[in-house]
């Protein structure tokens, strides 16, 4: 297994008390080192995503607009939840770059599995809109661009989180070659695009407090048939953990 991260992902600053803060990644990396995981799987430095890959998913105007919003100092609110600091876009480019490099490593045979320890997250970022702490939709960018690699005809994105992966659905809803399975608490934020039902878009809403057994049953019932029908050449896990 390969593990990608980048020091600039910690440099994405947010207001004090914000739930998606640098401490999350700092503590994760510390735990990986203290438990010896990094002895077997040394941390690799994530490259930046290329503008061509971002534009292929989000469109050229969106990437440019994020650069325009980047503050030279302090913090800039994009919405009540989503903030930019001077190095936030750089962090997002490395986060997306980690996923894209991981895809290339797996497809190229370097390894079979890649874990990306990065921030800011991405699954709420829609085609032309940041939201929910997210700037670039790393997993959707990787999935969309992976389809241009010879031998990759189908991709599956499996998204588990307390929040629906609205951005990933938005970016992939018109591309039947990308299966998106998203489990989430409902009703809850963001309340967008969760009611789309297509063969390649599988939304699995769950009530608050759903236990592990019920979660596994829902995944087995909703996701496995779709995955087997889709026959993906590449699987991307979009892991929220909250």
What role is predicted for each listed range?
Residues 1-242:
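HDAC/HDAC-like amidohydrolase catalytic core signature
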